[in-house]
């Protein structure tokens, strides 16, 4: 233990003073003051939304040097769970709040932040990619139910007269972890196939009757790439990244449409136009909307917020959401990550009302992207 100097002691030598100054500087560096510490925000959940969230986080941090945002892809199920438990600032989900989800995670607020889709990917060696595989919802459901087992099944041949499909067993690939991507697919299948609806239904983690499972969006595209004669599903970004072909799905008006930023955007606009007074921007209003170039398995991507966060954390969340629904909707951020914007002109009043409720009555202004 150091002793105090008495009044008669000699003054410290220059070398001692330098040592003390060095230790003081080091302690300031190692143990920063509160003013030096960064605000930390955490986002976890949807692996589909992860690439866009990462871009948003880095862009937001540049504009707000005192903020650090950690983003992780744990699956939509974990996004809901950790937001509900208050373990993260924001949960991310491809799945809207069904009655079951609301019962399991009460009081959560879903805010649409972007649009994406779920595409059907496949690996058919030696088959030309110039013409995409065509599938209607019922045929696709029968494949995932194991009731269509070979690529040259008469129902597949009837939908694809321009493709020479071989007599090869179909290898089904699906998600292992609770997934919003799976929720979107099973919701689509439930709306297009009575058999799927009655036997499996809509779920983040259904009881798959057949197939091989993989974790995460990257796991699905990786599995399909590695397994010949396989079929699976993934989001637009991951499909483009994998280089795999995606099928054209039959939409409400009978057109076979592939997933693209245009067809996703058209689905959102058509949905809002068809149901302008809807109080829930969920996928039920995006499926089966009319239009020619409208992709039928488009979906809103959500941030899930716990309204019981402490006031300081909620203020940080408010600022981030304000930015995401404003400058964050800029095409330079969205399109590079494979996403389309929320149709803001139509949904602005509804989103503003949601955020007023979420932010304890504070007013909220959705700014113009730029």
Task: Give the ranges of each region predicted by the language model.
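Bacterial N-terminal signal peptides
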Residues: 20-30
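Generic N-terminal simple sequence motifs
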Residues: 9-10, 28, 61
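N-terminal secretory signal peptides that target proteins for export/translocation
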Residues: 1-15
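Flexible loop/hinge segments at secondary-structure junctions
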Residues: 36-370
